[in-house]
């Protein structure tokens, strides 16, 4: 995993702010037209819905994820790992420590 994600991007200045500021991100479009978000999650439990499929890379931190339809089968992810979520779905996430992430909308 490289610290440099993209050299040429279109970045939106306005932040996406969720859960009273406990989750924030900024969207950008890379040089190939792919939309991504770089964000930070503070410790807590959150539920997100998806419209498009998502590839969620955990850059640093630790989370547990419960995918829609998986009952109580929480999966753990740490910095350097990723998970994918299908379109028109949802997932619950427990953030155990401050977590940096990069979400790619597929």
What is each residue range found by the language model?
Residues 50-65:
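Short, conserved beta-strand element in jelly-roll/cupin
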Residues 1-34:
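A short, N-terminal "cap"/entry segment at the start of jelly-roll beta-barrel domains
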Residues 19, 46-48:
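Short loop/turn motifs at secondary-structure junctions and domain boundaries
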Residues 86-106:
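Ligand-binding loop in jelly-roll beta-barrel domains
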Residues 41-43, 86:
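Surface-exposed, low-hydrophobicity beta-strand/loop segments enriched in small/polar/acidic residues
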Residues 32-41, 101:
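Small beta-barrel nucleic-acid-binding modules, principally OB-folds
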Residues 70-88:
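Short acidic-glycine-tyrosine-enriched beta hairpin
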């Amino acid at each position: 995993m490289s610290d440099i994600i993209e050299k040429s991007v279109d970045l939106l200045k306005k932040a996406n702010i969720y859960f009273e500021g406990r989750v924030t991100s900024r969207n950008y479009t890379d040089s190939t037209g792919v939309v991504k978000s770089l964000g930070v999650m503070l410790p807590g439990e959150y539920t997100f819905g998806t419209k498009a499929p998502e590839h969620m890379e955990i850059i640093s931190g630790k989370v547990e994820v419960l995918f829609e339809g998986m009952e109580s089968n929480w999966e753990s992810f740490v910095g350097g790992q990723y998970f994918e979520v299908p379109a028109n779905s949802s997932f619950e996430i427990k953030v155990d420590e401050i977590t940096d992430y990069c979400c790619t909308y597929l």
